[in-house]
C-alpha cells in the first residue's frame, strides 16, 4: 500500500488500501496472539485459586434478627420517604423489642449502617448481632466502664446502584442526614433516657459498606448535615481515593468535591473535623474482586491523627483476606468491630463516644498489627507507675547482645533482667508462647516507677507443625497466638531496666528475648528487571537472634506478584516453626506466612498502584520479616509469579476494555475518512482499515503504548496533561511530594511497559470478534431475506431509488420518533436510555444495508462500510451508558414515580439520534472540501487520543466527544 497526500483534483487516481494475502496473515497472527492473551488472563482470573495466607478463612455465623421499620420517619421529615426507609435492628432475646408491637424502645447508643452498591439493609444484622451478644453475654470482656448497648439503625435503599449514579449517591446522603436528625430526636422522646437522666445522644456512629462509606463522608459535606452529629466513621471495602467506575460524570464530580472538602477541613488545625472526626478504612485485600483494594486508601485525604487504612490480613486475631460481600458477615471481623465500637463509646458524654485520641489509640490496637511505626506511640504509655511484686535481688541479669532462650519449666528462675543502655542504637525484642506473664519497664534499677508492658505486646500467629494457616490461632480458635514486641532505643529512653517474670505451664511453651545493638534488617537491591532473569537467593541463619528482616526498596509495584520458596531442615527440635511477616509501610498491609520445611508462598501486595496518589517521601519497600528458631537455617528463593500477576491485572484495568477499543475504533475511522475525502471516494471497510493501521503504524503505536505511560511520570508533564483535559477533575496536588497519575494506564514502574501493548492486542482481538459476530448476523439476515423473497415474492424497495429520501430530512414516522424521544429525555427518562434505543436502530440499519449490499455491492458498499464502523463505535459506547439505564430501570421497578433527576440533557443524545435516523435513510456524510475533511479527521484523532490518554478515568466524557463527532457527521449528511 502506498500512502499519498490529499489529491488536488478528484480525477487523480487513488490507490485504496486492500486486504492482501500477506496482510491477512499478519493480522491473523495479531488476532491469534490477542485471543490467546485474553484467554490466559481470563482463565487465570477465574481458575487460579489463592493459597496460604491468601486463603479465605472466615467462619460462618448465626443470629436471631428482627427489624422494626421506623414508620414515623415519613415525608414530614424527608422528601425521599417514599423511596427509602429506615429500620432498627433488634437481636431477639437480647435487645429491647417494641412495646405493643409498634412502640420502639431506645436505651442504647445509636449506630447507622449504610449499605453499598446494590446492598441490603439486612446486611447490618451480622455486626449488630455481635454487638448485642458481646454486651449482654460477655460484658466483662469489654475494657470500657462507660460502655452501653448499641442501637443499630439501618437504611433500606431498595438495593440502589450507588456506584453507577452520582444523583443516587447524593440522594442517599441527603436522606441519611435527615435520618440522623430524626434518630437523635427519637432519643429525646425515649422513656429509658428520661428515667435514667443520662445525656442524650448528640451524634451517631456511621458504619458504611462499599459505596456506603463514601456516602458517609459525603453526608458531612452537605447543607442539611447537623454540625457535630457525626464524629466516628468505620468503612468496609469503601473506595475512598478514587471512583471504581467512571461512567457517570456526577460520580466523579462528587468524589472531587468530597475529597477536596475533607482535605481542606482536615488541614485546618482548629476545625471540628481535625479535632474530633475519625475514619478507619478496612479492606479485605486480595480477595475483593469487586473493586481494587488499592482504592480504599485514605492517604492524602485523612491524616494519620484522624484515620488510616488497614487490611483484614493485618488485623490481629483475624489474619485472613475477605471478599467484598463477606466483609460484613465474617465472624472474626464482626466480633472485633463490635468490640471496638463498644470500647470507644462513652455513655456519660453527649457525643456518646470517647475522645479522638482514645478512639484512634483503640483503632490502632484493634486493627493494626502493632508492629507499624505509627503504633510506637501507643506502647509503654501506662501512666499508673507502680512497684512490681518482684524481688529484683532475685533476678538473673541477661547480658547485652545475649539471646535469652527459655523452653522448659526447669529453666525458669524468679525473673530475668535486662539493663538498658543510654544508646539509642539498642533495641529489645521478645517472642513468647505464654498467654500470661509480667514484664516491667522501670525508670530505676531498684524496681520503682515501673510500667507493666504486657499490653504493649502484639499478637502474632501461633506457628508449629500443627498449624497450616495464620487463622488457626485467630479469635475463636482453641490455640492461643504468640506474643511479640519490638522496641527501639528511642522508646526505651527514660527506662533503666526491663524485668521479665512468667511461668511455663505447657511443655511447648517458650520465651525468646534479646537486648542488643544488632541490625537485624538487610537490604536487597534487586529490582524487577533483574528478578525477571535471575531469582533472588539467600540463606538466613543466626544462632544469636530469632528475627531477621529483609527489605526490597526496588520492589514496590502492586502490579507484580512474586513467589517465595523456602527450604529448611525439619529435623531440629525447634520451639516453633519459622514464620514470615510480609508488609508494606503505607497502606498498613501485613500478611503472615507459616513456613513449612519446603514450601512455596505467593507474595502479592497493595503498595504503589495505578491512579492512586503517591507520596514520594515514604518508604515504598516490600519488607519480609522472618521469625526463625535459634540455630535454624532457611534458604530463600524469590521470583516473579507471572500467573498471579496476570490474574490481578483484570481487576485494576477492567475499564481499559472499554477505553482502548474506542481509541482503536476512532483511529480506524480516522484512517477510513483519510481516504474518503470526496463524494466520489471509496469508504474502505472496517477490517481493511484496522489491518492496514496495524500493518503501517504498528511500530509507532507499540512504541507509544510502551513508552508513553512511563514517560509521563513527571510532575511537569502531569500538570500539562491536567490543563489539556477539558474537564480537569483530578487536580495536581499542591504538595510537591505528592504525585497523582490519572492518565493512560496510571503506570509508574518501567518494568510494566508491556501492559499497554498487551491490552492493545487484546482490544484488537475483541474488535475482530465483534466484527465477525456482526458479519454472522448479517449473513443470517441475508439468507432470511432471500428466503422470504423466494417463497413469498415480496421484494424490498431500493431506498436509493426512492427520490423522496433526498427531498425530506426526515419522514413523518421519524419526526414522531424524534419528538417522542426528545420529550421523554427532557421530562422522564435519562438520555442513556434513549442511546440504547438508538443503538438498536443502528443495528437494524446495518442489517438492512447488508441485504442491499448483497444485491448491489458497488452501489451500497460505501454506505454499508460506514454504517458498520459507526455501529462498532456505538457498541462500545453501550457499556458507558448501560449502568445509568440499570439505575433508571431499578427506580422504575420500585415504582419511584419522581422523574429521574439527572441526565435529561437532550443535547447529549440529539446528534447521535439525528445521525442514526439519517443513516437509516442510507445517507452518508459528504466531504465537499478540505475543511470538512480536516474537521472530521481532527475530531476522530482527538477521540482516539483522549480515549487512551484520559479514557479510563473519564469514560463518560469519551461518550460526549463521540456525540460531538456524530453532530458533525449529521451536519455533513444534510449538505
UniProtKB/Swiss-Prot annotation:
Gene: BST1
Lineage: Eukaryota, Fungi, Dikarya, Ascomycota, Saccharomycotina
Compartments it resides in: Endoplasmic reticulum membrane
Glycosylation site residues: 49, 276, 384, 407, 419, 488, 696, 867
Record's bilayer topology term: Multi-pass membrane protein
Organism from which the protein derives: Kluyveromyces lactis (strain ATCC 8585 / CBS 2359 / DSM 70799 / NBRC 1267 / NRRL Y-1140 / WM37) (Yeast)
Membrane-crossing residue ranges in chain numbering: 27-47, 655-675, 699-719, 751-771, 818-838, 868-888, 932-952, 955-975
Any GO CC annotation of this UniProt entry: endoplasmic reticulum membrane
EC number: 3.1.-.-
Gene Ontology MF annotations: phosphatidylinositol deacylase activity
Record: active site: 210
Protein's name in the database: GPI inositol-deacylase
PANTHER family with a match to the protein in the record: GPI INOSITOL-DEACYLASE (PTHR15495:SF7), NEGATIVE REGULATOR OF VESICLE FORMATION-RELATED (PTHR15495)
